[in-house]
């Protein structure tokens, strides 16, 4: 088993922090705009239950778009591939994650579940009789994956996003017009913004990454937390679409299945080897953590983590 050196990891974090001045926090969401752009932390979770970390890994980060991969896993378990991919595609895009442009082409279904339009469709498919019931089902799934029953969501961030989610509302109405979703838009927005506001530490993120790295199995008990096929689909989307419209560049430079969020979080899964959680709020122009990507690039090269 490869041993990760903590002193080396601390040095990598300090090196990557130097790039923070070139990034910017997601201030278009008021609650996220309060983040310290110079913050950077990482946790690596290995199959033998070892955690190596650097930076302040007690800081909680909201999942934002990282939640898309978890919601997709839950919906695939509930409804199966055929039903899910009847409503959302599988292809990557070079358009920004919030773009409506490709929806205007035939068919009108979103290109993939990692862009906002596709994620809204996936969230609309979470089973339950009310927003609170559906959110609780998702939270229960997240808690099992992370091995942490205390995980919840940030009401402040959820409220901030709900009040400013005008573009996502427009995506919902477009999707409703084309009969891809059929529920009340405000209820869907409430569920989606609370989903994005689920918060956890880098260690929790790394534990979820490890579950994916182990093909959906619990690292302690080997119990399947999701079917192997679902874990495989999730990791495939993480490679092709997980880093927005710079996923190709990330695959070449880092080569690890990963999903980012505009909070500055990154969830990564190195098949069979480890899960990684990163938090660095300074974003690049694509919405990915600038310092986090630099850190993962250094880590991948040092420990030969690329899957390619």
From Swiss-Prot:
GO BP term, example: glutamate biosynthetic process
Organism: Geobacillus kaustophilus (strain HTA426)
Highest rank taxon of the organism: Bacteria
Catalytic activity: L-glutamine + H2O = L-glutamate + NH4(+)
Protein name: Glutaminase
Binding site for substrate: 65, 116, 161, 168, 192, 244, 262
Subunit structure: Homotetramer.
Keywords for the protein's UniProt record, in alphabetical order: Hydrolase
InterPro entries: Beta-lactam/transpept-like, Glutaminase
Enzyme class (EC, first level): hydrolase
Molecular function as annotated in GO: glutaminase activity
Assigned protein family: Belongs to the glutaminase family.
């Amino acid at each position: 088993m490869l041993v990760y050196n903590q002193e080396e990891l601390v040095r990598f974090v300090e090196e990557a922090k130097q790039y923070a001045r070139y990034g910017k926090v997601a201030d278009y969401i008021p609650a996220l705009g309060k983040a310290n752009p110079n913050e950077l932390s990482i946790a690596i979770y290995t199959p033998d239950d070892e955690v190596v970390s650097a930076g302040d890994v007690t800081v909680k980060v909201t999942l934002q778009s990282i939640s898309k991969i978890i919601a997709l896993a839950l919906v695939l378990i509930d409804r199966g591939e055929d039903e899910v991919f009847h409503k959302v595609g599988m292809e990557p895009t070079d358009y920004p994650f919030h773009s409506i442009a490709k929806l205007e082409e035939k068919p009108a279904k979103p290109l993939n579940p990692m862009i906002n339009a596709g994620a809204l469709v996936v969230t609309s498919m979470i089973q339950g009789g009310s927003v609170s019931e559906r959110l609780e089902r998702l939270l229960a799934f997240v808690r099992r994956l992370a091995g942490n029953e205390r995980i919840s969501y940030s009401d402040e961030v959820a409220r901030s996003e709900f009040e400013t989610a005008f573009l996502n509302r427009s995506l919902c109405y477009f999707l409703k017009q084309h009969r891809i979703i059929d529920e009340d838009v405000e209820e869907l927005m409430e569920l989606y913004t609370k989903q994005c506001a689920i918060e956890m530490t880098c260690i929790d993120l790394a534990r979820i990454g490890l579950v994916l790295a182990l093909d959906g199995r619990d690292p302690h008990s080997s119990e399947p937390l999701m079917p192997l096929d679902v874990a495989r689909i999730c990791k495939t989307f993480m490679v092709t679409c997980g880093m927005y419209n710079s996923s190709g560049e990330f695959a070449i430079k880092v080569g690890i299945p990963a999903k980012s969020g505009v909070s500055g979080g990154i969830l990564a899964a190195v098949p069979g080897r480890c899960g990684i959680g990163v938090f660095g709020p300074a974003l690049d122009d694509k919405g990915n953590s600038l310092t986090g990507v630099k850190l993962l690039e250094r880590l991948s090269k040092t420990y030969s983590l690329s899957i390619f």
